[in-house]
Swiss-Prot record:
This is Aklavinone 7-beta-L-rhodosaminyltransferase. Involved in the biosynthesis of the anthracycline antitumor agent aclacinomycin A. Catalyzes the transfer of the proximal deoxyhexose, L-rhodosamine, from dTDP-beta-L-rhodosamine to the C7-OH of aklavinone aglycone to yield aclacinomycin T (rhodosaminyl-aklavinone). It can also use dTDP-2-deoxy-beta-L-fucose, TDP-2-deoxyfucose, dTDP-4-amino-2-deoxyrhamnose, TDP-L-rhodosamine as sugar donor and epsilon-rhodomycinone as sugar acceptor. Residues 1-23 form the signal peptide. It comes from Streptomyces galilaeus. It comes from the Bacteria.
Length: 443
């Protein structure tokens, strides 16, 4: 079958799709990855075939222009709809309005959607897998009759929030599942998607938001309840297009507990800032009887006033190679870093401060596999004390090992491919372009 993956142009949101894309290719399926031109180099560096669509999203302008308002609205706010009192009607309406106006419509602007639909009409994919903010994928699928699903790399709290918001509005999901095919006037996301689909003469229903099903790479302990089908899949680390090289020093077992410090890749390549100063983090580890590996680029290093003797600075090292040698990790809360540490069984200190990073860190702490240190509460003493606890108390390592086992109990991307073949055959609204909709090895 033909499979089209699509993600807006940010590496952190694309990387989670690479292992499944390659599993599909290895099973004999044709795969294309569509995104704005800025992601083309990353797609091709992953060995995949890129389809540039639209123009590059102006994320830097968004952050500079309305970023303070967006970030202040979301910062340090849990997104867990199941926690009483967390998500007020005012917050949910503000979230829906702000995210649709300043983010969703920016990364799925009309030229991007039009180009993606045009490509899908010509190439006729059987299945479209879309990053959960890249609603253009759902639009293209509904226009062309392809089956479609969201590919999740982080807990699906955004969908829980949407259900909570629609319930507060007293609005049933539009379409066959419950509503009358129209959206509530205060449902900004639904209104925009209804208008966008209307440009192609296609009615809106809630599948344009939810997908027909989801492929979820998050362990079950972190998945909120879902009213849509979910295909669980093991997270397989792909740490981006940087050089995946094991340096000489990493081939030698550490003589002291090794701790990874990383503030992620997104802040290096975008206007989204790190909330915790690098200098503060390194001061917190100074003098401890540990070996610290800090992944910092030249700009981040320029902010340092002092490098402790127990700190090794490296520009880039693949986390999936580094973390198996580590006793702990201190990080910014990014989903890729968090997921890689989780599947490697490494206790974590996550300094999450926005969106789902807060809830992932809080849940990790509740499960005993790490500690959450909100970015606005980070001090040298507080971070040092938590790190000492993480290293000294065996319960953290044991809990992290349990989460690793949970993650490993999920099917691999290769094992998920036959499931996707069956679901595609069930949900595709047209006949396949040519015979052979399943791979030869599947009966």
């Amino acid at each position: 079958m033909r499979v089209l993956l699509t993600s807006f142009a940010l590496d952190a949101h694309f990387n989670g799709s690479v292992p499944l894309a390659w599993a599909l290719r290895a099973a004999g399926h044709e795969v294309r990855v569509a995104s704005q031109p800025a992601l083309t180099a990353s797609i091709t560096a992953a060995g995949l075939t890129a389809v540039p669509v639209g123009a590059d999203p102006r994320l830097d302008e968004m952050v500079k222009g309305v970023g303070d308002a967006v970030l202040s609205h979301h910062a340090d706010q849990s997104l867990d709809a199941d926690t009483p009192g967390q998500l007020t009607p005012a917050f949910l309406q503000g979230w829906d309005t702000m995210m649709t106006a300043t983010f969703y419509t920016l990364i799925n602007d009309d030229p991007m959607v039009d180009d993606l639909v045009a490509f899908a009409r010509g190439w006729e994919p059987d299945l479209i897998l879309w990053e959960p903010f890249t609603f253009a994928g759902a639009v293209a699928a509904k226009v062309t009759g392809a089956a479609h699903a969201r590919l999740l790399s982080f807990p699906d709290l955004f969908m829980s929030m949407r259900r909570a918001y629609l319930a507060q509005l007293g609005a049933a999901p539009a379409g066959p599942a419950g509503g009358n095919g129209t959206t509530h006037p205060d449902d900004s996301l639904g209104q925009w998607l209804e208008w966008t689909l209307g440009r192609y003469g296609v009615p809106f229903d809630e599948e344009a938001v939810t997908g027909q099903w989801s492929v979820d790479q998050v362990p079950r302990s972190f998945r909120p309840p879902s009213d849509r089908p979910v295909v669980g899949m093991r997270y397989v680390p792909y740490n981006g297009p940087g050089p995946a090289v094991v340096p000489d020093w990493l081939r030698v077992p550490p003589t002291r507990p090794r701790v990874c410090v990383t503030l992620g890749m997104t802040a290096r390549t975008s206007e989204f800032p790190n909330a915790v100063p690098v200098d503060l983090v390194l001061k917190a580890v100074e003098g401890l009887d540990i070996e610290v590996v800090a992944t910092l680029d030249a700009e981040e290093r320029a902010l340092l006033t002092h490098v402790p003797d127990n700190v090794r600075l490296v520009d880039h090292v693949p986390l999936h190679a580094l973390l198996p040698t580590c006793a702990a990790i201190v990080h910014h809360g990014g989903a890729g870093t968090w997921s890689t540490a989780l599947v490697e069984g490494v206790p974590q200190i996550a300094m999450g401060w926005i969106w789902d990073a807060i809830d992932r860190a809080q849940r990790q702490q509740a499960l005993g596999a790490g500690l959450h240190l909100p970015s606005h509460e980070v001090t040298v003493e507080g971070l040092r004390g938590r790190l000492v606890r993480l290293l000294d108390e065996p319960s953290f390592t044991a809990a992290a090992a349990r989460l690793r086992a949970e993650a490993e109990s999920e099917p691999t991307p290769a094992q998920v491919v036959p499931v996707l073949e069956r679901l595609t055959a069930q949900h595709r609204a047209r006949e396949p372009r040519r015979p052979g909709g399943t791979s030869p090895c599947v009966s």
